Swiss-Prot record:
Record SMART domains: S1 (SM00316), YqgFc (SM00732)
Record protein name field: Transcription elongation factor SPT6 homolog
UniProt domain S1 motif: residue ranges: 1103-1174
Keyword annotations from UniProtKB, A to Z: Elongation factor, Nucleus, Protein biosynthesis, Repeat, Transcription, Transcription regulation
Gene Ontology cellular component terms for the protein in this record: nucleus; plasmodesma
Organism: Arabidopsis thaliana (Mouse-ear cress)
Length: 1647
């Protein structure tokens, strides 16, 4: 069967284990599998262009070329991959062994083994036997069983089941001497070392067992042969089963079903599952008293800080936390392995301050408890995890620092430097030990890496290395300037100690020479004079200060406490953000302190900044800035007054200024942003959790008193109803009290309003059927899904049926049917269930509407279980919209909070085990029970379902629960007569139906007996019957429990410290497992309105602008419909300002008109809004400040005017430099670029115009309309001009050149260049695989197509909005979209450096060569840099010479797009983007789908490009190459495989180092080595340093991609995702997943 092409990474994973060694050992097996795949792939054809490419086929087609091109290094790598195949012997080797009388095991094909095993013949059975570890020959299972039966085993012999490590095992008697076989037996693990001898220890072959012992065994056990046969079958079956699981299921499937080996270990280990999962990342926690005390101190400080941020309270409760309680919690958690729910329920006495214990005093004994979210416990739990990870990191860094220091010490011979290094190392280790936060550890790490930069440690020979980029600090240090830096005075560490007042430093001694005189001694080739030496030394000192942990801690303290943030709108933002916009409340913030940010406000600011709608500035107020500078000067400058002291102080001031402004303050701003993001996410996560808590802590629907039968706790019978538009129809589902489906009814005509006779008859029939349906099943409540306004009519129709039933058949109606409630239920969760995998497993035969209705009814019966149902492996619960800003949270963050909430609430509610054993949907919360998890819960569930029911709690141990897990879980698992146990007469302990833990049963029994003795005035026996009688007595008479004075009773028993435990016992004896959840409440009118309309308080409010469609006109008013289906009423007087003069609205409007109105008022009960269209009202912003306004909100009109004035001046400047031309041609006009795009805006695709160029009088520009909003500009160079005067220059040249083509006049340009180009453009636009839309929109279409055809490689073409004039070929092979660029030329389409006259040929080539690496020669670094765009088209500017400009060698398109700027204005307004109901249901009247989205600035992941030049956005150009010109380079061009500038340089999507790169390859390793300039050299007109790096050195620091022309200062390290010293950032590497030769297929790295 055909399969999708897989990446090289996937192949490596399949062939190699962690050590790089192949996993599958049988070479024949690999060869056979390859043959099978080749045979299968012969018949593959492309079907509907969903093609499948096989890597092996492609490799065979170009095998000869590959062999010629493979370097020695690549061949060595391939040889390593095939290593396992070579370990088998050839037939000649086997013959040679036979000739030498050597016994051996000849490998068989895997398929032959399997066939022999299935046939059961002797040969097949023996193939699975093991070798005898003593004799060297095969040992049968029979021998092994005999050993076990008769104890005939040598004590010194190893176990028989130890696997052999070698393929050849030689018998001593046959082989002879050891030396004879030395050449045959080689240890396969020591590939490069000397051969090892085969059997270093010779053993004799077992001769057999004693006959007498065999006879005795036969008499005892029967025929041993029979036993052997059974065992052989069992072994074969087990082996086949293991193979079946691993071979027939994908690893993801096994992982999802918790069937991996690791899952099995978790199930078996007697430690709570969630603890095991946590410890996989944190490691085992320390359990000694010192460690627990140290951690509790740290957690106490962190917790106090968090509570202080919340104004000193938590949830409005002003309680204090006891540090000893934290230590006790850690002991219970880590030492005794108890989870939070258990501690909160059964260990209250040991950590009282962590709980709100107000409900547990004697005065509140009779009060019903409420469910509580134990937030403090969970905060401590999270801090505990942070502490363990911090401790783990510190230990790892300590080991690394020690190793690195020792290696550095061996390389340095200068005694002074050795002493300095030792001092620095000891200082770093000391700082590391006292570091208390991740940020402080980062500071220590920064200091260590500054003084001990990472070298090539741990890099194996021959391994690819990232080109190292030397920092200015390292250059200065190697030049010996560290000695000069040490002469400035105090060291960075001394300054830090002085600032933090930890240590008083000695007074500074002034030098006896000037700084310049001292610097002369260090002049060298790199630093040619004393000024250069001082500048370098000052840089070193400033960097050291900025990396000193104590200095950073001091500056951080001031900055984080006092820094302020201001926001203002950009020009686009001012247009887009109106009074109802998401960013309206943060549009103008003035100097808001960091500590005043609440909730998720900062996340909105961050989003606004990313979308270029807001400008954000951080600032340290002037008084605090002056204080900071003053403190630094005070402790760093000399107090001397001599000339020398003053000169040295001038140098020190420069150092401090550089340290603060160039390093520390930018670093602090970055930290402040990170801190605000972390805080905002934490608070948003808490709000998200609170929203979920409110849902799951709500109790089920309660039956009315008259409906209560013998089982008071039985859930109500529910008739669930889902509205349907006709296909599917209205659906009614009847659920019994266990949530199982009893009956289903479809009634499509029930809500019909037609007066047609036939329709009326169908409606009457449906009413009768619904009536009979309800009469037959007697529901307690009707659950109606609230999805749109039609549901209100459906509710009325159901009530009509109920009234008819009560009137016509009162005797047949059950109690309460005349008062039957119809309850609206939100359909958002049921819709998730309808489309989930679990619904397909639970209700496989039912339709989607039925599944949704089942979820509606079950949600009324048991909200907790219904929510937990969607918390399975699919995690559908994460799609439940609970918070308007939840999209800012990662899925893992959300699920962590979901798990926390579900664990807390589930254990307070408990689970009825016997009921769940009969109805598996009740088992869904089981994974959240204390001690369990998805793996242990699934195992327990299977065991309980097999048993059917359970009668004693302690029997849970027999169902796979270990002792520790049982202790955690037992109190929350309820054992009662339900499910199958309801019909059993077996005894059930009443205490098992309470929350009383088994460890407290004796206390409960003693209390019950004491009360019983008191009531009956006698002393009963202590036998079980008497105790049971006492428990029944107190349970039947709760009043007797309330008489107990708890304090006196505890004093009499001397158990004063058990008050909370006894309170729990009394409560549970009164009413076991009482439901503590909030009682069910029907939705309020407001809630019903928002559910049915699909609106929220934010999307519909008075003053909001909406669009309405006129449906009907009446005298004096127009009846309209909003997008949500709400009815809008527009009165005549509200239509316009002169409305009183309008006689009839019909004269002004007609049906179908779309109006833009403002909401005047809302009538929620009638689902109506009143609208107003008056122009004066539309301009009025009186509703703008109705919402809560931030205290720091101050609108700055002056700033706005400056923005507008700047934009106006830029336009004037363009017009000022515009020079008209004296050219007469129908296709030429004297207009600017903006005017040209405006002129072409309403023209057809392919229309063009020639205009003057902004480059001067020797150029023209051809502007071509590619698509709506996409225009390309092609430069035309004029030649043969006479430069006599301005008039001759304004005339057209004698020759016109575009790229390498020359034309005589504009007519020839049109005929030979433009017309063919337009023809090819229209061919592409009309091609069957062309898709309109942006890159992301096309990707979404592809994902949908991929979902429908998962086995195909789907692809399509689209317009490149980022690079006008090119097309994008997008395709998906597995999951992620990949992109390649196609150039548009008059000769055709250029793809991967090949020209194609028509698209079909291009497609055929692409399908055959989808995985081909780009093998052509690579251009120089400088030629590539000339083609790399330094600004996006939306920025309307070139990048200082190259960028988007055109080319003289081939010519370059330049492009701009309408998709930026004010063209986006207003897209956020009026509820844009609401194209449907939040629950996912369709709108009854349709709706609009307005919205806006924005991709990342450099959304070029996995992209290749072959353009035809430089598709830019400005009129400026450069002297060299365009995209993919003759000079090479470009995206996906010949930038691979060759060495450039001393290193092997890869291109974008090229082959970097020799293997394929699927559009995400690295930029090559070694690029720019040997001083060959970096990417972005000369960018922005400034020369970059010779150290490489993308735009490195421009403007004093390396520039990141997307920075302004490389000329502005960026981080000192630069590079895309790169850090100082070439380290990986974000844990995954830089450009294209490290500069190794593996293919990066969206698997981690990339841009």
């Amino acid at each position: 069967m055909a399969r999708n092409a897989i990446s090289d990474d996937e192949e490596d994973h399949e062939l190699e284990d962690d050590d790089g060694e192949p996993v599958h050992g049988d070479p024949a097996e690999h060869d056979e599998n390859d043959d099978e795949e080749d045979d299968d792939d012969v018949g593959n054809e492309y079907e509907n262009d969903g093609f499948i490419v096989n890597d092996e086929d492609e490799e065979e087609e170009e095998e000869e070329d590959e062999e010629r091109k493979d370097s020695d290094e690549e061949r060595q790598k391939k040889k390593k991959k095939r290593k396992k195949k070579d370990e088998g012997l050839d037939e000649d080797d086997y013959l040679l062994l036979q000739d030498n009388n050597v016994k051996f095991k000849k490998r068989q094909y895997k398929r032959l083994k399997k066939a022999q095993r299935e046939q059961g013949n002797g040969q097949g059975e023996s193939s699975d036997d093991e070798f005898d570890s003593r004799g060297g020959t095969r040992r049968s299972a029979e021998d092994k069983i005999k050993d076990r039966l008769f104890d005939d085993v040598d004590v010194d012999d190893p176990p028989d089941d130890v696997g052999d490590e070698e393929d050849l095992v030689v018998e001593e008697d046959v082989v002879g001497s050891e030396d004879e076989m030395a050449d045959f037996i080689v240890d396969e693990d020591d590939e490069h070392g000397p051969p090892k001898r085969g059997n270093s220890k010779k053993k004799k072959y077992r001769q057999g067992s004693d006959i007498t012992a065999m006879r005795d065994a036969n008499e005892i056990f029967g025929d041993v042969d029979e036993l052997l046969t059974i065992r052989k079958k069992g072994l074969a079956s087990n082996q086949r089963m293991e193979r079946r699981l691993e071979d027939e299921f994908e690893p993801t499937v096994l992982s999802e079903k918790y069937m991996t080996g690791n899952d099995d270990e978790i199930r078996q280990l007697d430690i709570p599952e969630r603890m095991q999962i946590s410890e996989e990342s944190t490691g085992s926690p320390p359990v000694d008293e010192i460690s627990i005390e140290e951690e509790s101190n740290w957690i106490y400080a962190q917790l106090a800080s968090q509570l202080r941020e919340s104004d000193g309270t938590f949830d409005g409760r002003g309680f204090s936390v006891n540090k000893d309680d934290i230590a006790k919690f850690l002991e219970l958690h880590h030492v005794q392995k108890l989870e939070i729910p258990f501690i909160a329920m059964y260990r209250k006495e040991q950590c009282r301050s962590l709980l709100d214990t107000g409900d547990f005093d004697g005065a509140n004994q009779g009060k019903k408890p409420e469910t509580k979210w134990h937030k403090v416990f969970w905060m401590i739990h999270d801090l505990d995890k942070k502490w363990l990870l911090l401790r783990k990191r510190k230990m790892a860094l300590h080991g690394y620092y020690t190793k690195r220091y020792e290696e550095e010490s061996r390389r340095v011979y200068d005694e002074t430097r050795l002493n300095l290094n030792q001092y620095l190392f000891e200082s770093v280790i000391k700082s590391l030990k006292v570091a208390e936060t991740e940020r402080e550890v980062d500071d220590v790490d920064s200091k260590f890496n500054l003084h001990f930069p990472p070298g090539e440690i741990g890099v194996d020979e021959g391994q690819y290395k990232r080109p190292k980029r030397k920092s200015q600090y390292s250059i200065c240090s190697k030049a010996g300037l560290w000695e000069v830096a040490n002469k400035f005075g105090y060291s960075a560490e001394q300054l830090g100690l002085a600032l933090s007042l930890e240590k008083l430093v000695d007074e500074l001694e002034d030098a006896k020479e000037t700084p310049e005189e001292m610097a002369k001694n260090f002049v060298c080739a790199m630093f040619e004079n004393s000024l250069a030496v001082l500048k370098g030394a000052r840089h070193m000192a400033a960097v050291e200060i900025s990396c000193e942990p104590s200095v950073k801690k001091y500056v951080r303290g001031i900055y984080m406490e006092n820094a302020v943030v201001s926001t203002s709108p950009t020009a686009d933002g001012n247009t887009v953000i109106d009074s109802f916009h998401q960013f309206s409340g943060i549009k103008w913030l003035r100097e808001k302190p960091l500590s005043k940010f609440e909730g998720a406000q900062w996340l909105l600011i961050q989003k606004g900044e990313e979308e270029k709608l807001l400008q954000v500035t951080f600032k340290l107020p002037e008084n605090y800035m002056n204080r900071l500078i003053s403190d630094c000067n005070e402790h760093y400058l000399s107090v001397g007054v001599s000339k020398y002291a003053q000169l040295w102080n001038e140098q020190r001031k420069l150092i401090l200024e550089d340290a603060l402004h160039a390093f520390l303050l930018p670093s602090m701003e970055k930290e402040a942003r990170s801190l605000l993001t972390s805080r905002a996410k934490s608070r948003l996560l808490s709000e998200y959790g609170q929203a979920l808590w409110n849902k799951v802590s709500a109790g089920p629907y309660q039956k009315k008193e008259m409906d209560i039968n013998l089982d008071e706790e039985a859930a109500p019978r529910v008739m669930a109803c889902c509205w349907g538009p006709g296909k599917p129809p209205n659906t009614f589902v009847m659920l019994d009290s266990s949530g199982e489906v009893l009956d289903v009814l479809y009634a499509g005509s029930l809500t019909s309003r037609s007066q047609n006779v036939n329709d009326q008859q169908r409606k009457k029939s449906d009413q009768d059927r619904v009536l009979k349906f309800m009469m037959d099943h007697q529901p307690h409540v009707v659950a109606l899904g609230a999805v749109n306004l039609s549901c209100t009519r459906l509710k009325d129709d159901i009530y009509e049926v109920i009234f008819q039933m009560v009137e016509e058949k009162p005797r047949d109606v059950g109690h309460g049917m005349d008062d039957l409630s119809i309850v609206y239920v939100d359909e958002s969760l049921p819709r998730l269930y309808e489309n989930s995998r679990i619904s397909g497993e639970q209700l496989p035969q039912q339709s989607g509407n039925v599944r949704r209705a089942v979820a509606l009814g079950r949600y009324l019966q048991n909200p907790l279980a219904m929510v937990a149902t969607l918390c399975g492996p699919g995690r559908e619960i994460l799609s439940w919209k609970l918070h308007p800003l939840e999209n800012f949270l990662q899925l893992d963050e959300k699920y962590g909070m979901v798990e926390q909430v579900m664990v807390d609430i589930t254990n307070q509610v408990g689970i009825d085990i016997n009921l769940a054993a009969s109805h598996d949907w009740f088992f869904s919360p089981l994974q959240f029970i204390s001690g369990l998890g998805p793996r242990k819960a699934a195992s327990l569930q299977r065991s309980l379902v097999r048993a059917g029911s359970i009668f004693v709690r302690k029997d849970l141990i027999m169902h796979g629960l270990g002792k520790k897990v049982f202790v955690n879980a037992a109190g929350f698992l309820r054992i009662r007569r339900s499910g199958l146990a309801a019909s059993s007469s077996q005894f059930i302990d009443l205490l098992d139906d309470t929350r009383i833990h088994p460890e407290s049963y004796s206390l409960a029994q003693e209390l019950a007996k004491d009360i019983y003795d008191e009531d009956v005035r006698g002393d009963s026996n202590d036998d079980e019957d008497a105790i049971e009688m006492a428990i029944e007595h107190v349970r039947d008479r709760p009043a007797s429990l309330r008489k107990v004075v708890l304090d006196e009773y505890l004093a009499s028993k001397k158990r004063e410290n058990k008050k909370e435990t006894y309170s729990n016992i009394i409560r549970e004896l009164s009413c076991g497992f009482q439901d503590w959840r909030i009682p069910f409440k029907e939705p309020s009118p407001d809630e019903e309105f928002y559910m049915i309309s699909g609106e929220t308080e934010d999307t519909i409010a008075e003053g909001r602008i909406v669009q309405a469609s006129v449906r009907r006109l009446q005298n004096g008013r127009a009846i309209c419909v909003l997008d949500s289906g709400l009815t809008g009423m527009l009165m005549k007087e509200d239509f316009s300002d002169d409305g009183r003069d309008i006689v009839d609205l019909a004269d002004q409007l007609k049906e179908g008109d779309i109006l833009t109105c403002k909401i005047k008022s809302i009538q929620k009960q009638r689902y109506q809004v009143f609208l107003i269209c008056k122009e004066s009202e539309m301009r009025n912003n009186r509703h703008q400040h109705n919402q809560n306004v931030d205290a720091y909100y101050h609108e700055d009109r002056n700033s706005l005017q400056l923005v507008k004035e700047k934009a106006r001046k830029e336009k004037e400047l363009v017009r000022k430099h515009f020079k008209s031309r004296m050219i007469v041609h129908p296709r030429f006009q004297n207009i600017t670029a903006d005017q040209a795009t405006e002129y072409l805006s309403d023209k057809d695709f392919g229309e063009s115009i020639v205009r003057p160029s902004s480059r001067g009088l020797n150029f023209l520009t051809l502007t071509l309309k590619i698509y709506d909003g996409v225009y390309a500009h092609k430069e035309i160079a004029e030649g043969g001009k006479e430069n006599k005067d301005i008039t001759s220059l304004q005339c057209i040249g004698k020759t016109l050149t575009i790229g390498e083509d020359t034309f005589e006049d504009l007519d020839e340009v049109m005929d030979r260049y433009v017309d063919p180009l337009v023809s090819h453009l229209k061919t592409m636009l009309n091609y069957r695989k062309f898709r309109k839309g942006t890159k992301s929109e096309v990707d979404d279409l592809l994902r949908i197509e991929k979902g429908e055809n998962p086995s195909r490689i789907v692809y399509c073409f689209g317009i490149s909005h980022e690079h006008p004039g090119t097309f994008i070929l997008s395709y998906i092979r597995s999951t992620n979209p990949h992109h390649e660029y196609i150039g548009l030329y008059p000769k055709g389409f250029k793809f991967r450096k090949r020209m194609f006259e028509d698209i079909d040929r291009l497609v055929a080539y692409f399908q055959r060569h989808i995985d081909d690496p780009l093998q052509e020669s690579a251009p120089s670094i400088r030629s590539i840099a000339a083609k790399v765009p330094m600004r996006s088209p939306a920025d309307h500017g070139s990048s200082g010479g190259s960028g988007w400009g055109s080319s003289q060698s081939e010519g370059g398109w330049k492009g701009n797009s309408d998709r930026s700027g004010s063209g986006r204005g207003g897209e956020y307004r009026n509820g844009g983007g609401r194209d449907g109901h939040p629950s996912g249901a369709p709108r009854p009247y349709g709706g609009r789908g307005r919205g806006r989205g924005r991709g990342r600035r450099d959304d070029m992941n996995s992209d290749r490009q072959d353009g035809n030049g430089d598709w830019g956005n400005n009129d400026t150009g450069t002297a060299d190459g365009g995209w993919g010109n003759s000079g090479g380079g470009g995206w996906g061009s010949e930038s691979a495989g060759k060495k450039t500038g001393g290193g092997s340089t890869g291109g974008w999507g090229s082959e970097s180092g020799g293997n394929k790169s699927d559009g995400a390859g690295s930029w090559g390793s070694g690029s720019g080595g040997g001083g060959s300039g970096g990417w972005g050299n000369d960018s922005g007109g400034k020369k970059s340093s010779e150290d490489g790096g993308f735009g490195s050195g421009s403007g004093g620091g390396g520039s990141d991609w997307g920075n302004e022309s490389g000329g502005k200062k960026s981080s000192a390290d630069g590079g895309w995702g790169s850090e100082s010293g070439g380290k990986k950032s974000d844990g995954e590497g830089g450009w294209g997943n490290e500069p190794s030769s593996r293919k990066s297929d969206g698997g981690g790295g990339g841009w």
